[in-house]
């Protein structure tokens, strides 16, 4: 006689806990085995990336590097160095300032290329603007005629230099510069006696193509100092340090006498301005706004 399986209370037959767990385990194994099997299947070879077109966009640093090397092949009197800075690209990171300090082994307080900051607007509509300010390398530099020993002068290529061996530290040129682009080096050593001495105390600088060891008494200690467009790098066919480290690609450099150079192209834009043009200094640093 067959066993009667109907329950008198009307409920369906129950499922044991062991049977339920076994069924769940089988389902989980099936779910996992699908992706594993797919992953184990041999992948097809990726399609090769298309070749970059030869006439594609050129890296601006490479273009400016070529501009510099082309200019250096000319006599010094036939080139005219200039810089353009796109203020729309500047993010105020001060990478250019730090690169300049590292390149020229500058002590605290001697800054060739600060990034000036300005807050504009009213709360809550406030924004900040940044303006890198190197030496303007003026065509009519007011710092030159005030030097009593002719230690500062304009080279044929437009760079305004300081002859450290002739400078007497009178600082007349610092007062005469309307851009605040010159600072005095008092020869201080700020980390003497500390565990970590700074680079400017232990490593020589190579400004103007010479080696300057810092001892607190000899040049450039006691001299006026300023940006010189990294002339020692230019003479080696390299761009200024501030140009190569700009995060936003906001700084451009080259020969204004070369119509093929990038800086010549940018300086002719309608949105270009120069600082304090009303003074007649004719700065060679152009700002795109």
What are these regions (language model features)?
Residues 95-101, 105-108, 143, 152, ...:
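Short functional micro-motifs and their immediate structural scaffolds
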Residues 49-55, 59-63, 102-131, 153-166, ...:
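Non-heme iron-sulfur electron-transfer modules
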Residues 75-98:
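Mature N-terminal segment immediately following signal peptide/propeptide cleavage
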Residues 3-28:
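N-terminal secretory signal peptides and thylakoid transit peptides that target proteins
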Residues 12-21, 39, 43-47, 96, ...:
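Twin-arginine (Tat) signal peptide motif
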Residues 14, 34-83, 278-280, 286-289:
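C-terminal segment of N-terminal export signals and the immediately downstream linker at the start
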């Amino acid at each position: 006689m067959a066993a009667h399986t109907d329950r008198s209370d009307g409920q369906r037959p129950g499922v044991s806990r062991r049977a339920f767990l076994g069924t769940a385990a089988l389902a989980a194994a099936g779910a996992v085995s699908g992706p594993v099997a797919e992953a184990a299947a041999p992948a097809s070879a990726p399609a090769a990336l298309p070749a970059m077109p030869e006439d594609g966009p050129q890296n601006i640093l490479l273009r400016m590097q070529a501009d510099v090397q082309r200019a250096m092949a000319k006599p010094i009197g036939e080139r005219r160095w200039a810089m353009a800075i796109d203020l729309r690209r500047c993010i105020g990171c001060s990478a250019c300032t730090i690169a300049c300090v590292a390149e020229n082994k500058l002590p605290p307080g001697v800054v060739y290329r600060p990034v000036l900051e300005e807050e504009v607007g009213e709360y809550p509509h406030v924004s900040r603007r940044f303006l890198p300010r190197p030496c303007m390398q003026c065509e009519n530099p007011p710092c030159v005629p005030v030097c009593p020993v002719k230690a500062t002068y304009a080279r044929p290529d437009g760079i305004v230099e300081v002859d450290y061996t002739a400078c007497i530290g009178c600082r007349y040129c610092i007062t005469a510069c309307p851009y605040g682009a010159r600072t005095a080096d008092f020869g201080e050593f700020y980390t003497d006696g500390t565990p970590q001495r700074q680079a400017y105390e232990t490593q020589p600088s190579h400004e103007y193509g010479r080696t300057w060891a810092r001892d607190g008494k000899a040049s450039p200690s006691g001299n006026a100092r300023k940006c010189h467009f990294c002339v020692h790098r230019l003479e080696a066919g390299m761009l200024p340090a501030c140009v190569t480290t700009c995060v936003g690609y906001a700084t451009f450099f080259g020969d204004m006498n070369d119509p093929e150079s990038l800086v010549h192209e940018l300086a002719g834009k309608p949105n270009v301005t120069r600082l304090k043009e009303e003074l007649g200094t004719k700065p060679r640093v152009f700002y795109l706004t």
